Amino acid sequence: MYDYILNALVKIEAYLDNESDSVEIPNNLFKTDILVDYYYYPGHFVDVDDDEKELIAATLTDAGYADHYDALAELLWKANIEPIPKEELVDGNSYCFIMISFGITPVQAHLKAKKAKYEQVTFFCLPYTDREGEQRFKILVVPNTFGSIFKEMKCACLLDIESEEQLDKTYWSLLERAIGQICQTLSIDVTGFALSDTTYQQKTLETYSPYLTQFCQLTQIQNIEGFKARWLEIQQQQKQLIQQVKDEGFYGTVKPAFLNYRFLLCEFLTSTYEDHWQMDYDALFDYLAKYLEQPFELDEEDGLQPNDIARKVEAESNYSLLDIETRLESYCFLPCLKTDVESILNLAEILDFPMSKLGD
C-alpha cells in the first residue's frame, strides 16, 4: 500500500549518504520546516568531543538507558529488526537510520480536546534487508515528544503498514506528504506522490527598496536601479529560476539565498574575489594588495585558511573580509571597511543574502 513511500526512502538515504547528513526542507505543508537527519551508529554518538559525551550520557540516563547501543537495539526490536551485535559495530561498520520531524496542527484526540495549536511529529525510518535481498524500511512514529533523540527512541511506536486505525492512517498521510516534499526539493526522481507547488514568500520592492539602496551604497554597487530591478525579477520568477539551476545540475535544496547569489550578487558585486576551492593564493594576495593599496603576504606557517587570511587583513588594514556562501565548490570574498561590517551583515540578513564575516 505504501511501497512508493518506502522506495522513495531508499533514494533519500542515498542522497543523505552522499550529499549531506542533515537538511532542512522549507514548505507550505506544515507548521515548520521538515528536518531530515541521517544518523550513523556508533559514529554519531562516540566520535564527539568531551562536552558532547557528557551531554549524551546525561540524556541517555534521562531516557532510561545505560548505553546508546541499548537505545538503538530497543528501537530496532520495536520494528522487528534484529540488531547487529554491538561487538560487530566497529572499524567503520555502522547501522544508519533516518529521522524526519516537523510541526503540525494536532491530530491526536487529547491534544485537540485541549485546543492545542501545535504537535511535533517525528518518524524513525529504519532500513533492513528483506528475504529477497532488497533494502526496505520500517517506520516508527514519535507523537508529540520533546527532548533528546534517546527520549524519542524510547517513545517511538511501530507504524504498521497494514493498520486500519485512523490515527495511523493520518500519520502515514503526513509522512507521505513530507517525503514527497523532500524528494521534490532535493530533485530526487520518484513516482506516486502528489507534489505541491512550493515557492517562497515574495518580498515587495516597496518594502525592501531602502535596504537595497543602503546595501548598494555600502558595497560600492554603482547601478542601484539595475540591482533593484534584478532583485525584483528574482522575487517574481523564483519557480523558473529554481528549475533553471536544477537543470544546470545543482543538486540540493535551492533556497532564496542561493538565487540571490547566483542571479544578483554574482553580477553586481564587481569588487569580490572568486576562486575554485583549490585556491590560487598568489592571485588572492595580489587582489588583496591592490584592494588594500598596500603589500599583502601570508606565510604558510601563519595559516592559509580563509579565517587566517581575514585576520591578517584586519590586523594590517581598516578592512574586514566577508564570505559569500556560493554553495558551489568555490570561494567568494568581499572586503569592506571594518566600520561597515555590522550594517552590511544586518542588511544581508534582511535581504536573504548569504554573507558572513571571516576571521572571528
Swiss-Prot record:
Pfam families: DUF7821 (PF25134). InterPro entries: DUF7821. To P.multocida PM1082. This is Uncharacterized protein PM0657.
